[in-house]
Amino acid sequence: ARAVSRRGAEGLMQLMPATAADLDVQDSFDPRDNIDGGVRHLKRLMARFHNNVPLALAAYNAGEQAVINYRGIPPYRETRQYVVRVLRRYDREAARLVAQQLAAPKSSTPKIVRVSYAGGRAVTAPVMPALTLAEGGKGAQPDKKKSESP
C-alpha cells in the first residue's frame, strides 16, 4: 500500500515531498528509504529545538516554520493531539522498559539512565541493547555491536 495523507505526506513516516527531497529520500514508498529519512528528519528537528521533544514532534507534524512562528506548539488541533498521543506512547514504552528490567534476573543488572522529555515527567530506565529486525522480519533481536550507552 502507498500511504498518502490528505495533505500529501507519503510513506510510513509521512514525509512531505519537499522534506523527502531535502533529505535525499529517493522513494518515499520504500520502507527503508522512508524510515531512514524520517529518523534523520526527527534527529534534525531535535537538534533545532534543543532536544525539546514536544517542540520537535510539533515541528514534525505541523512543520518547523509553524513552531517558529508560534514560538511553541501551534494551536492546530491535529498537531496538539499528535504531540499528546506520541508523548503518552513514549511514557508507556519507558515504563514498559523499566518493568521489563525489574522482572529480569538480578544477575543481568543493567546500567541505569534517565529517560525524560522537556516539560514532562522523567522516569528511570535501563540502557537496552539497540534492536534490529531479525532475518526475515520475524521480530527484533539485540544488536550486540550497537549496545551500551545512548
Regions found by a protein language model. Give the residues of each.
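Catalytic glycan-binding domains that act on GlcNAc-containing polysaccharides
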Residues: 1-109
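Cell-wall glycan-active module
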Residues: 88-150
